[in-house]
């Protein structure tokens, strides 16, 4: 095999800093969001939602336009075989990305809840960073009675980092507080932090409050 393509999910330096050296070593082309050309030096082609990137002879990745963490963020969805999501910094295991480096929480809500949450439950999640331990702790800070998150935290705190857990969307909906927007316990605890929150807040209100708390947690 050989490297022919470099896929950048977004423009942050920790995701693109190796582009130049990799291109020099392999001659690969750099692909990223169509609107990221002025942010990613040496980008060869821009990707639009719905485009397909072929890897090797058998893997096809659908491009998803997933703004929120930044406004030029893509995720890559593998439909062939077991579905998989390469989610960059939009969706983490048990969490979502921040929005203070070129993003917007209202947009991230629409991406995460109205787009990614609709992927098949057996979709494996491969994020750009492994923050699962800290994210599970935040979930339990917001929803202490979440027994699935309690059990999983105990497991991942002891796991071999070379055999790290891979979650799927079904599990994310149980452990990721940003998908648990109708949880009675989550809402009750939020209302202690935000006394003006309505008794029955909508999902976007809950998401934005959680994102605000997570910014300084």
Language-model segments: residues:
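Charged helix-capping and loop-helix junction motifs
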Residues: 102-111
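Residue-level signal for inorganic ion chemistry
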Residues: 22, 89, 129, 169
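Active-site metal-binding loops of divalent metal-dependent hydrolases
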Residues: 11, 35-36, 69-70, 90-91, ...
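Accessory terminal helices/loops
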Residues: 110-124, 131-217
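A short acidic, helix-capping loop that chelates divalent metal ions and anchors anionic groups
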Residues: 38-41, 94-101, 135
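Hydrophobic residues in well-ordered beta-strands that form the structural core
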Residues: 31-32, 86-87, 127
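Conserved beta-strand hairpin/beta-sheet module of binuclear metal-dependent hydrolase folds
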Residues: 1-2, 75-88, 94
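Active-site HxH/HxHxD metal-binding segment of metal-dependent hydrolases
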Residues: 1-65, 82-83, 151, 155
């Amino acid at each position: 095999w050989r490297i022919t393509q470099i896929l950048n999910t977004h423009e942050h330096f920790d995701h693109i800093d190796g582009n130049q050296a990799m291109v020099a070593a392999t001659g690969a082309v750099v692909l990223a969001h169509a609107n990221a050309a002025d942010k990613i030096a040496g980008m060869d082609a821009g990707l639009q939602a719905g485009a397909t990137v072929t890897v090797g002879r058998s893997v096809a990745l659908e491009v998803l336009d997933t703004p929120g963490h930044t406004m030029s963020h893509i995720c890559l969805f593998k439909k062939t075989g077991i579905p998989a999501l390469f989610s960059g910094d939009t969706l983490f295991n048990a969490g979502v990305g921040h929005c203070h480096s070129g993003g917007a929480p209202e947009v991230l809500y629409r991406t995460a809840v109205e787009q990614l949450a609709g992927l098949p439950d057996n979709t494996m999640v491969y994020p750009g960073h492994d923050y699962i331990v800290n994210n599970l702790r935040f979930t339990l800070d917001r929803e202490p009675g979440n027994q699935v998150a309690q059990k999983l935290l105990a497991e991942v705190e002891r796991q071999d980092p070379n055999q790290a857990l891979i979650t799927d969307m079904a599990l994310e909906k149980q452990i990721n507080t940003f998908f648990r927007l109708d949880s009675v316990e989550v809402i009750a605890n939020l209302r202690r932090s935000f006394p003006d929150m309505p008794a029955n807040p909508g999902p976007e209100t809950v998401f934005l409050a959680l994102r605000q708390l997570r910014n300084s947690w």
